[in-house]
């Protein structure tokens, strides 16, 4: 059966019953239909925090490696083992759903449901973010049109518009055409909604007041004297925040095995910080003995950003890290072409395992216990599985092979046991670089300790920006690296575990509301395009409302 068929064949429990499993009362949730709900915060009484398990992965193939599937399967396995566990996941972006991925709610018998709703419009959070973002864009252009009291320079507006769609044609636009009554002409463009700073702000805010403070700090551009102008200067922070008053509340759903899952926020890890909301993770920590969460793409992206950007705000470090690896991805990193990934090749697998070992070493830099989860595919041979298990065992790291796609939580019981054991070990969290280190120090530490590179090289533009940032005190904010997810380098074609390479930073983007500076490397894009055969071509809906083509 296909993922969507498995999902549709499962009878879901009422969301009130799922809420009751973790002690949430009727007045603490706002149902959206029968199987989804918003959680009203703060919870009535503070509860002790449970254990936190972060799931990340190696560098993926373009098809993805089933990290979300393993997260769901692990959560179900922990619940089967008698440990009350709550998942904390990111919300899928409609762009990749209609583009390459076709869905992002796990797979097989390890899914969060209702998968159609979650993958499509869900509870409207993405739309609220899009409207709030574009309302701010309209207010900026209206201010310029209506006298421009702040003396905003139309050539230096940094707030682009957004859509939750992959649309390369909108990357660069010209607006304000049509005469004096149609605005001031200027160059503009669109990003995808999950790249919006508002998404990062929402995911890092601790409550509604913090959200408004962060919104007011957002940089929108510069004035004619090259001085920064913020949302607070425009005096519209309250209006933007009120558009997000419901979106800030975490969403409660369930797994196929009727265990609770909180889904909230969805920044990409290659162009943003790649973690679900602090509020969702904090809520899960209060509701469960264990919280299993994930960070986008590999440990070099989402994993690093969880540790360096989210953890300081969350106020809790992971008790264990799970790195998901697949045999096909390691063969891909070992030089096998995509068309040949289902053919047994132990030698390429062993060569590609250097990528996994690099990620293990990277996460060990933080002083947190690491467990490797092999997400087994039907094409994987016994010889390949044994070879990979031996590679990991040789470096004294616990490893478990999972079959969660086929078996749900039952396929991750060994992994669950090893994760529980790991969380009982001492965790000595260590920062990658000193607190308040300058941007160059942080980027160099990430390049050397996480990527395995040698140095960071700045473009002429990036060097000029650093000098400007120093004037305003932005040069000591945390850095958020925007980099390809397919390689440890900034070149998607350099697979495996390259060494002594250079990371090239072409420009910086201050995200003052989120509290970090994005360093854009290589040719990473903030508005993706659709592939030659978008997943949307295979989607349909029957007269009775049955959806097909999501996966």
From Swiss-Prot:
GO BP, sorted A to Z: tetrahydrofolate interconversion
Gene that this polypeptide is encoded by: fhs
InterPro entries for the chain: Formate_THF_ligase (IPR000559), Formate_THF_ligase_CS (IPR020628), P-loop_NTPase (IPR027417)
Species for this entry: Levilactobacillus brevis (strain ATCC 367 / BCRC 12310 / CIP 105137 / JCM 1170 / LMG 11437 / NCIMB 947 / NCTC 947)
Protein name per the record: Formate--tetrahydrofolate ligase
Enzyme Commission (EC) number: 6.3.4.3
Family: Belongs to the formate--tetrahydrofolate ligase family.
NCBIfam families per the UniProt record, alphabetical: PRK13505.1
Sites where the protein binds ATP: 61-68
UniProt-listed SUPFAM superfamilies: P-loop containing nucleoside triphosphate hydrolases
């Amino acid at each position: 059966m296909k993922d969507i068929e498995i999902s549709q064949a499962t009878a879901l429990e009422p969301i009130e019953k799922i809420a009751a499993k973790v002690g949430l009362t009727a007045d603490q949730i706002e149902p959206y239909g029968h199987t989804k709900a918003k959680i009203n915060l703060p919870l009535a009484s503070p509860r002790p925090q449970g254990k936190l398990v972060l799931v990340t992965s190696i560098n993926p193939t373009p098809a993805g490696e089933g990290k979300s599937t393993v997260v769901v399967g692990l959560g179900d396995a922990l619940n089967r083992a008698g440990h009350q566990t709550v998942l904390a996941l990111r919300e899928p972006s409609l762009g990749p759903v209609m583009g390459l991925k076709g869905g992002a709610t796990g797979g097989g018998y390890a899914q969060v449901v209702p998968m159609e709703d979650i993958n499509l419009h869900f509870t409207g959070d993405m739309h609220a973010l899009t409207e709030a973002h574009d309302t701010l864009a309209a207010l900026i252009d209206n201010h310029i049109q209506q006298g421009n009291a702040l003396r905003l320079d139309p050539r230096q507006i940094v707030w682009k518009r957004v859509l939750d769609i992959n649309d390369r044609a909108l990357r660069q636009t010209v607006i304000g055409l049509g005469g004096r009554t149609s605005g001031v002409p200027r160059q503009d463009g669109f990003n995808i909604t999950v790249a919006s700073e508002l998404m990062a702000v929402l995911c890092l805010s601790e409550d509604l007041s913090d959200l408004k403070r962060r919104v007011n700090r957002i940089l929108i551009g510069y004035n004619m004297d090259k001085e920064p102008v913020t949302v607070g200067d425009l005096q519209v922070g309250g209006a933007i925040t009120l558009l997000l008053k419901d979106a800030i509340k975490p969403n409660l759903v369930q797994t196929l095995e009727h265990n609770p899952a909180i889904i909230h926020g969805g920044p990409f890890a290659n162009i943003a910080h790649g973690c679900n909301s602090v509020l969702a993770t904090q809520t899960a920590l209060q509701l469960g003995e264990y919280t299993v969460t994930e960070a986008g793409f590999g440990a070099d992206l989402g994993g690093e950003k969880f540790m360096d950007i989210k953890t300081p705000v969350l106020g809790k470090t992971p008790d264990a890290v799970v790195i998901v690896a697949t045999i096909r991805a390691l063969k891909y990193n070992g030089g096998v072409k995509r068309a040949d990934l289902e053919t047994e090749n132990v030698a390429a697998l062993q060569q590609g395992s250097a990528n996994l070992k690099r990620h293990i070493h990277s996460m060990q830099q933080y002083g947190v216990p690491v467990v490797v989860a092999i997400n087994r595919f039907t094409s994987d041979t016994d010889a390949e599985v044994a070879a990979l298990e031996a590679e990991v065992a040789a470096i004294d790291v616990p490893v478990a092979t999972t079959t969660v796609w086929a078996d749900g939580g039952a396929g991750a019981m060994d992994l669950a046991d090893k994760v529980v054991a790991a969380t009982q070990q001492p965790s000595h969290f260590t920062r990658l670089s000193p607190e308040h280190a300058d941007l160059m120090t942080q980027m160099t530490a990430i390049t050397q300790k996480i990527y395995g590179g040698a140095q960071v090289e700045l473009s002429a533009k990036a060097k000029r920006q650093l000098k400007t940032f120093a004037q305003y005190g932005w040069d000591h904010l945390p850095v958020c690296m925007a980099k390809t997810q397919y390689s440890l380098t900034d070149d998607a074609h350099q697979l495996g575990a390259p060494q002594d390479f250079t990371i090239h930073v072409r420009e910086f983007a201050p995200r003052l509301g989120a509290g970090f500076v994005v360093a854009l490397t290589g040719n990473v894009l903030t508005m993706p395009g659709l592939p030659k055969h978008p997943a949307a071509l295979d989607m349909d809906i029957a007269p009775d409302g049955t959806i097909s083509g999501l996966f």
